[in-house]
């Protein structure tokens, strides 16, 4: 717990990844546009071609989360191309691996939880969040076995989740809200993919999980003790893009943001082609994905414009980011609150969306 999140992220950047195996694919697999590959570069690309072209597509890192799976619908329905951009989706079973790839510029954009965007600003990692995909509303939760009826019952129990991730922060928040700290439980550092099966097998007493692993744990006999329904707005899932791309190719970023909003309209209408692309890309049944969607609030243009505005509650993304930074510092996960937090937010693309 005393290890800072900054140190953790630095190790990620240096390639010293000690977390493995989150998600639905093999530990080392990276799924690119529906196929499994072992090379993040996905084959030979024409680096002389403009970024976002067919010859040199924008590489977007996607991890297992309900809202982020909608990018498969955007891709499969041909929406990117309709907006004049080419995007290659890179699926990372291990969320922290996607962070490492993004920070080392192996990815052009990334699906990232807003809280995870705080610490890198202290290390001068240049990127901005340009879009909110969704807000967790039950898609993240604390599952327990029978006999545990309150958070205070976790005292002395084994609780598993992934160190340095938003689920780790969520666990700390749950404990804090109940007058406890991480030292009151036996914390077990596991990737989300490992924590779910460990919980189902009875190897740990509780686990903090995100979808789809959360649903798997509940189907495996777990009981939901606490979820983001009790802290709405705490965990926004966003799209982040490197600053140099924003500066040099704003039309590309605008095309991607426009594509998201086009996709949200099809998602809300349950367009068959769009939905089937999600089911295929995410390797989920229609029933399972529909259940997962109940745990998030998908953000369209209007919701994005509202959340990027200043406010004094978790409806506001700037407020949420500040509160996340304060919380991370209070529990020792970062040493200082970045002075330039506002600089990691860029609302020009949602304002200019068609």
Predicted regions and their residues:
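Short, glycine-/small- and polar/acidic-enriched structural segments
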Residues: 29-189, 205-211, 224-227, 233
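Solvent-exposed, acidic/flexible segments
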Residues: 64, 91-95, 135, 164-168, ...
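Short, low-complexity disordered leader/linker segments with a strong preference
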Residues: 1-55, 352-354
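Short polybasic/polar patches that bind polyanions
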Residues: 81, 121, 176, 218, ...
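Conserved C-terminal helix/tail region of periplasmic/extracytoplasmic solute-binding proteins
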Residues: 321-354
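Pocket-lining segment of extracytoplasmic ligand-binding domains
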Residues: 115-116, 187-188, 194-283
């Amino acid at each position: 717990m005393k290890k800072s999140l900054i140190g953790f992220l630095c190790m990620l950047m240096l390639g010293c990844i000690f977390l493995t195996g989150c998600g639905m694919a093999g530990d080392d697999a990276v799924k690119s546009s529906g196929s499994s590959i072992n090379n993040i570069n996905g084959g030979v690309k024409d680096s002389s071609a403009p970024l976002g072209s067919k010859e040199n597509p924008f590489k977007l890192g996607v991890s297992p989360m309900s809202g982020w799976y909608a990018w498969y619908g955007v891709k499969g329905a041909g929406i990117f191309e309709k907006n004049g951009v080419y995007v290659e989706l890179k699926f990372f079973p291990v969320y922290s691996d996607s962070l490492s790839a993004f920070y080392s510029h192996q990815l052009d954009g990334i699906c990232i939880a807003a809280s995870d965007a705080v610490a890198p600003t202290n290390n001068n990692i240049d990127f901005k969040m340009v879009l909110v995909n969704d807000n967790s509303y039950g898609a993240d939760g604390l599952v327990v076995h029978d006999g545990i009826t309150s958070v205070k019952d976790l005292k002395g129990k084994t609780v598993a989740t992934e160190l340095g991730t938003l689920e780790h922060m969520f666990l700390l928040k749950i404990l804090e809200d109940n007058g406890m700290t991480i030292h009151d439980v036996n914390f077990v550092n596991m990737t989300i993919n490992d924590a779910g099966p460990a919980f189902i097998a009875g190897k740990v007493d509780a686990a903090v999980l995100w979808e789809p692993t959360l649903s798997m744990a509940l189907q495996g006999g777990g009981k939901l003790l606490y979820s983001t329904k009790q802290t709405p707005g705490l965990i926004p899932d966003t799209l982040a893009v490197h600053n140099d791309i924003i500066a040099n190719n704003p039309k590309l970023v605008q095309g991607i943001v426009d594509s998201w909003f086009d996709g949200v309209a099809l998602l809300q209408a349950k367009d068959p082609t769009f939905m089937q692309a999600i089911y295929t890309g995410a390797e989920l049944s229609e029933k399972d994905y529909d259940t997962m969607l109940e745990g998030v609030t998908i953000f369209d243009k209007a919701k994005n414009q509202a959340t990027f505005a200043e406010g004094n509650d978790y409806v506001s993304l700037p407020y949420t980011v500040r509160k996340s930074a304060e919380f991370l510092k209070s529990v020792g996960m970062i040493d200082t609150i970045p002075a330039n937090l506002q600089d990691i937010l860029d609302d020009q693309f949602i304002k200019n969306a068609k």
